[in-house]
Amino acid sequence: MITLHSALTIAIAAKLPILLWGAPGSGKTSMITALAHDLDLPLEVVVGSIHEPSDFTGLPVVRETTTWFAPPHWAERLAEQGRGILFLDELTTAPPAVQAAMLRIVLEKTVGHLRLPPHVRIIAAANPPSVAADGWDLAAPLANRFIHLQWQPTAADIATGFISGFPRFTSLKAVSPNAAQIAAAKTHIGTFLRVRPQLVSVIPDSPDLAGQAWPSPRTWEMAAIAVATSWANGAGEDVITTLLIGAVGEAAGFEALSWLKNLDLPDPQTILRDPDGVALPIEVDRLHALLSAVVAVAVTELAETAAHDSDAAWETWRRAWRVIARVARTTPDVAATAAQSLAQHRPAGAPLPAELLELAPILRRAGLMP
């Protein structure tokens, strides 16, 4: 139960939509109510089965010469408060037309003509269609917009909760990742998908599996953000596993997790701070993944500093090239790929790296030298 609680708070910090699966009466709604209370967030509960599609797309209202899609009161309340949790309960009891109307809310946080504030989090709960009253399979486009988490409390969990109280979320508040951490995680996931391109998008054939987590470019990006947020909060492997599988499904999630574990790479931000002092891996695949992450972090830092701190941007530029120079001594092909990427983000007025002679062949490939 603690693993799921931690995964839930990390997904909230990552601003990712969450879908909680569990049997009827297992306490999903009670847990989300406790979560909102412990995190001091306003909570709006919306049960899809008792709403019409217009409750999510907005009710058309004629205003002079235009039509305004008026949002419902629950959306207006969230907008007024500026933050909160929108809890879409009993999702699999909502008919397909209502599920389709929810798509824009989950992905864009837009209800009619109203855009919900960035600090509104979206959580849904669903019973498996086989046990839901008048249940429907979750539509694949809607399912592919969530991190899927399984709520399966054991008898011991329930007994302990009754006797000693259920776990609180007050001690599990998570922080959001910074841009460099997200860039590094996306690079690692992208490098994995280069090795396993068959897993970029795998749409299940059966409706029941299509209503669960499965790989797509969207869910791989969600997986990368979840991994970055886990790193930012020092989460354990069990939490990362839960989130990865919740994003892309068991098969792809376990394979990606195994690949990431085998990489065992140093922190790319640490390497940028000390380009000559951190040992680099020898294996080509690990070296490629690490150098790609270093360049991704460098590009992120350049974008953040170039406009207002040219000295810091130039220093990041110089250090990134020093790392590439180290790699070029043993694996020039890997260095060439990184050089081509870094060269596209040269800060205005930044000098060429001091390692020019050593890097000359690489720089020519990157178009920095004739």
Model-derived features with residue positions:
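C-terminal regulatory/interaction module of P-loop NTP-utilizing enzymes
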Residues: 1-86, 91-370
